[in-house]
Amino acid sequence: MELFAKRMTWELDNEEGLSCLFFELEDGYFTLSRKTGAEELRLEMDDPANGQLIDPDCFEYALDNTRFRLNIVRNNRKVLRYLEEHHINTELYGEIVLHYTPLSKPQLEALSAVTLRLFFGELLF
């Protein structure tokens, strides 16, 4: 699914210990978040009812100054079993490409730091 962000914001370890990426879309939103110490990543699309907690090891991601790509790893039996056992909505969260206005180098570095925190928790800090 390709999405185009009108606006995006991010936070790294705010006062509540939350790191998050928020993408405002033309007709909705997409957000990824993780609390410090939490094992799972929360993904939410357009409605809190669509939110799901997912092990970040289920994903591979890539980002550059104009897009963020998120894919569920589908060639790993352990991941596939986890997705099935936890009733993960792979239709909604299986493959997402978010396009956004080009970022400056400092913005990209800040976005990269938040993304590392989301997917690796405290491992890299």
Regions found by a protein language model. Name each.
Residues 28-30, 37-39, 77, 105, ...:
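Generic "edge-of-domain/loop-turn" microfeature
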Residues 16-20, 29, 38, 58, ...:
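A generic structural signal for beta-strand entry/edge sites
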Residues 110-123:
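C-terminal partner/receptor-binding element of secreted or periplasmic proteins
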Residues 24-54:
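Short, well-structured hydrophobic secondary-structure segments
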Residues 49-109, 113:
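Amphipathic protein-protein interaction modules
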Residues 3, 10-14, 43, 52, ...:
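Generic detection of short hydrophobic beta-strand segments and adjacent strand-loop junctions
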Residues 1-31:
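Charge-rich, low-complexity N-terminal segments
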